[in-house]
């Protein structure tokens, strides 16, 4: 886990219901439109920055200066175009 990874106790993460592992998130109860809940994760979200950081950790527009796990999910998940 990178030192600058978003923690689930981070105030912004709590507000957005971010979980590092989408399977342990509220994505089924709070599913967003675009894909079935089980297919919603940070890797296919429009807020994820695909050009940043390591393989499993990327930047996110919602958590400036921090990294999210591609297997994560938050309540702002929005399907990336394309």
Swiss-Prot record:
Pfam assignment, any one: HIPIP
Any Gene Ontology CC annotation: periplasmic space
Family classification: Belongs to the high-potential iron-sulfur protein (HiPIP) family.
SUPFAM superfamilies the UniProt entry points to: HIPIP (high potential iron protein)
Assembly behavior: Homodimer.
Role, per record: Specific class of high-redox-potential 4Fe-4S ferredoxins. Functions in anaerobic electron transport in most purple and in some other photosynthetic bacteria and in at least one genus (Paracoccus) of halophilic, denitrifying bacteria.
Name of the protein in question: High-potential iron-sulfur protein
Organism in which the protein naturally occurs: Marichromatium purpuratum
Gene that specifies this protein: hip
Subcellular location: Periplasm
InterPro entries from the UniProt entry: High_potential_FeS_prot, HIPIP_sf
């Amino acid at each position: 886990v990178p030192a600058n990874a978003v923690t689930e106790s981070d105030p912004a993460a709590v507000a957005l219901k971010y979980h590092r592992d989408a399977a342990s998130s509220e994505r089924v109860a709070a599913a967003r439109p675009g894909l079935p809940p089980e297919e919603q994760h940070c890797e296919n979200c429009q807020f994820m920055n695909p050009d940043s950081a390591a393989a499993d950790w990327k930047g996110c527009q919602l958590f400036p200066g921090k990294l999210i796990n591609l297997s994560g999910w938050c309540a702002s998940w929005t399907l990336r175009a394309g």
